[in-house]
């Protein structure tokens, strides 16, 4: 059963008392655009956010996310050596962006990840996929399974590198933002380690044998303050696309743009959109990290309820310069929750509504472990429920 709790704390009236302000306006020639505030959960701008489209190399974010997940679980070592199969080299050494791997070469997972993220290597993506799962097909099965687990609902991956495959691989802007958010939130150290390298050197030129250094194609890296990721994409079919992120004064935005006509348009629009997000909108704090937001009922647990905690500082996005405006908050969860529940487990959502934006949704986590009640405890809970004492 869906449970909704309306909040009447001081935070819920933090901005109360003034007439609504018009939401800031933005327009872009990009066919698809999406701007998401990670702190508030607000979608600041959306243009065709759920339209299916080919991702091109932006699919490599999901390839990287699979690797990050395995590394953080201790199931994959960055020092693991991978062999470049001659067949893989033959297919990918001159197909689009390349890391310039050599047939039979031994390459670490660490260097392959740098080749994927920084150089957009199609060859590196497939070599990593085969190294992890045995075949690219088996790896894409892992990509799709993980995508479902992290909330990617309208995308499918048929390749490890996003190369056109007659429509088997498709994504949406909203899903790409979900992948980016997951990487940033769940793997902050790996994100910082791999996604903001300005360049990477691998391979040798033919004849002279000189080192090959390629620049990171990220159009906002080094140009927008706080920019630190994520991934470009381009094919004739997809046009020019980009999923990017930047953090300014503790506030992080994620942007997705696709279907642009040129490299220059991608640079211009990705810079314009994220700068507009930082300039036209502001975050107003609601709850600090670790603050108790509310409680949720628990069924068959050692405790009848569990505190709901802010996993990070939570805020609401409002137009810049607005000192007040109507804000309503409610907690939503499917309940009662069923024990056992682990501390830190995401169990509810805080839904914040303002007069200027669509509902802003951020997660809430359990503040305590709640074990399953023992035999006699369950009998007592049943007794209380029977007589309306629960």
Locations of the language-model features?
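Domain-terminus/edge residues, biased toward the C-terminal soluble/receptor-binding domains
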Residues: 152-156, 167-390
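Positively charged n-region of N-terminal signal peptides that target proteins for export
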Residues: 1-5
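Bacterial N-terminal signal peptides
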Residues: 6-16
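Generic marker of residues within folded, mature protein domains
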Residues: 11, 23, 45, 72-74, ...
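Intrinsically disordered/low-complexity terminal segments and short unstructured peptides
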Residues: 7-8, 27, 352
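Active-site-adjacent loops and short helices of periplasmic peptidoglycan-processing enzymes
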Residues: 20-188
């Amino acid at each position: 059963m869906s449970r909704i709790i309306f909040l009447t704390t001081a935070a819920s009236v933090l901005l109360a008392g003034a007439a609504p302000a018009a939401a800031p306006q933005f327009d872009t020639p990009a066919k698809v655009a999406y701007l998401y505030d990670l702190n508030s959960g607000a979608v600041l701008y959306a243009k065709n956010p759920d339209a299916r489209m080919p991702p091109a190399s932006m699919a490599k974010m999901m390839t990287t996310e699979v690797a990050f997940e395995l590394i953080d679980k201790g199931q994959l070592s960055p020092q693991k050596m991978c062999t470049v199969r001659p067949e893989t080299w033959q297919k990918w050494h001159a197909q689009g962006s390349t890391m310039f791997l050599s047939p039979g070469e031994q390459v670490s997972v660490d260097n392959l990840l740098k080749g994927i993220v920084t150089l957009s290597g199609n060859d590196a993506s497939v070599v990593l996929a085969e190294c992890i799962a045995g075949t690219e097909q088996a790896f894409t099965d892992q990509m799709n399974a993980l995508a479902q687990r992290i909330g990617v609902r309208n995308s499918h991956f048929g390749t490890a590198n996003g190369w056109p495959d007659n429509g088997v691989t498709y994504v949406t802007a909203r899903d790409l933002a979900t992948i980016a958010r997951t990487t940033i939130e769940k793997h902050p150290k790996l994100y910082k380690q791999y996604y903001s390298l300005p360049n990477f050197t691998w391979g040798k030129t033919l004849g002279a044998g000189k080192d090959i250094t390629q620049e990171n194609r990220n159009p906002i890296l080094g140009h927008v303050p706080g920019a630190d990721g994520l991934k470009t994409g381009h094919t004739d079919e997809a046009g020019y696309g980009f999923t990017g992120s930047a953090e300014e004064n503790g506030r992080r935005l994620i942007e997705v743009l696709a279907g642009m006509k040129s490299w220059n348009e991608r640079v211009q629009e990705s810079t314009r959109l994220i700068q507009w997000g930082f300039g036209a909108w502001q975050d107003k704090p609601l709850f600090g990290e670790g603050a108790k937001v509310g409680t949720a009922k628990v069924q068959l647990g050692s405790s009848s309820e569990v505190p709901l905690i802010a996993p990070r500082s939570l805020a609401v996005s409002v137009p810049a310069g607005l000192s007040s405006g109507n804000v309503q908050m409610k907690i939503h969860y499917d309940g009662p929750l069923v024990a056992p529940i682990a501390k830190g487990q995401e169990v509810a959502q805080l839904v914040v509504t303002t007069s200027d934006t669509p509902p802003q949704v951020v997660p809430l986590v359990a503040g305590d472990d709640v074990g399953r009640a023992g035999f006699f405890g369950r009998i007592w809970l049943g007794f209380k429920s029977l007589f309306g004492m629960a």
